[in-house]
Amino acid sequence: MSKVLIVEDDPLVSRMYQTVFQFEGFDVEMARNGEEGIEKLKSFKPIMILLDIMMPKMSGIDVLRIIKNNPDLKNIPVVVLTNLSGDKDVDTALDLGAVKYIVKSQNKPKEIVAQIKEILAGYTREEIPKAATKN
């Protein structure tokens, strides 16, 4: 099963995306803020991270920097999923290594899932990080 980490501070939005992704067959782990997202990555190795930008404790941009500067995490594709639609926000996220920038208010949840599946289909098995296994 494909593991996805969703880092989102809004509980209603978080629950909605968790439900939609689980319905589509994803194993979903949730984090309520950037710090929690980084902490969860110590034990949960997803094949993709969905990351909000505006969050308490640590912004999504700061989380993205940490992920892309960590040799163990930098190859995990990160999709920014936010309501910020300014060109500067988009450029910053993509320059830091996000593979896609999706504005939540401009896409239905099922459309977002379809975009995520399309992105994942573009990676070969060797490029997608393997999920953590129990030894």
Spans of model-derived segments:
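Conserved acidic carboxylate
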Residues: E8
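Two-component/phosphorelay signaling modules centered on CheY-like receiver
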Residues: P11-E29
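Helix N-cap/capping motif at the beta->alpha junctions
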Residues: M30-E39, G60
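Short amphipathic alpha-helix used as the core "switch/output" element in two-component signaling
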Residues: E39, I61-K74
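Active-site beta3 strand of CheY-like receiver
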Residues: F44-L50
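Active-site residues of response regulator receiver
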Residues: D52, T82
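Receiver (REC) domain active-site loop signature in two-component systems and cognate sites
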Residues: M55-M58
